[in-house]
Amino acid sequence: MSSPGSPAYFLLLNALNWDKGDLMSAGEVLERLEVAYREDAVRARGREGVELYYESTGAGPVVLTLNNFFMTTPTWRVFTDELSVGHRVVSYDLCGHGRSSHPEKYPTWDEHVEDVVGLLDALEIDQAYLLSTSISTVLARDVALKHPDRVKGIVLAGPALGPRGMRRHRLVQRAWLLTLEQHGMAALYAHLYPEVFGAEMIEELGTPGFLGLRESFLALSTKEDLVNGLKLALTGETSADVLARIEAPTLVVIGDDDVLLSPSGAKELAEKFPNGRYEIMPGAGHLPFLDDAAGFQALVAKFIDEVETRA
């Protein structure tokens, strides 16, 4: 239970006690979605001259966000603004995406893992909580397996990991890649939209929301970046057995309208971790923070508070 006075305590009060009329709707949150970079941001140097664009906000236990291939650093701001009160939130662009270095050869999963550790080293951070979503949950898993001493806890939001394997996720990702390669970015967005967003949110946003988010989507990445990312997503370990080796406290968060992982699947997945638990967000889709940014941040803050209390 979160202790009175902790950041998680106040976030939970907000999430549980606000009247429906006081809550910011998903549409209002997405109206605040940012895609612009900070021109004065400093880049961190990592392996072989790789430079990573990053932003750091707040103070306290460190939360490192891990982008899926469809997100960039600016998009995290609206989904971590409350979390940055009482925590240090560090967001960065993956190598090969956004404002980070674009090497001639796209990074492997192992190189992405080393980039995470290199960024922590550059910022003199000993340990961090990894906040991952969709395909970046694979990166969080691999960092925790290869560098357990650097990981204090893991949040898997709408994970691309399954309790029995990743075959279903791979089929979906392969279909996304095929759409992108044959029909382009706008077609990929139309393909993704009903699979990523929950039904409630799609109804709330309507056609104006669909079109507005499409403009943001097209501004976030290039076709080349997404092709590279989706091709990488089709590689790497798929067995759920490796999860038993992850000792870090782990929180699985899904929406009950996530088409890629059911609530019962989330429970089974959490049970694969020695120190795992799960939360189901009503009405949310594959990326639950899109549907309820405040509620999601409250769950993450509560999880961190509980881990910090036990430490």
Locate predicted features:
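Conserved HGGG/HGGXW glycine-rich cap/lid loop of the alpha/beta-hydrolase fold
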Residues: 46-102
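Flexible "cap/lid" loop of the alpha/beta hydrolase fold
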Residues: 141, 145-146, 152-182
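Catalytic active-site module of serine/aspartate enzymes centered on a nucleophile-bearing elbow/loop
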Residues: 276-311
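Active-site loop/oxyanion-hole signature of alpha/beta-hydrolase fold enzymes
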Residues: 81, 90-132, 298
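Conserved alpha/beta-hydrolase catalytic His-Asp/Glu region
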Residues: 166-167, 185-242
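Acidic catalytic loop of the alpha/beta-hydrolase fold
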Residues: 257-261
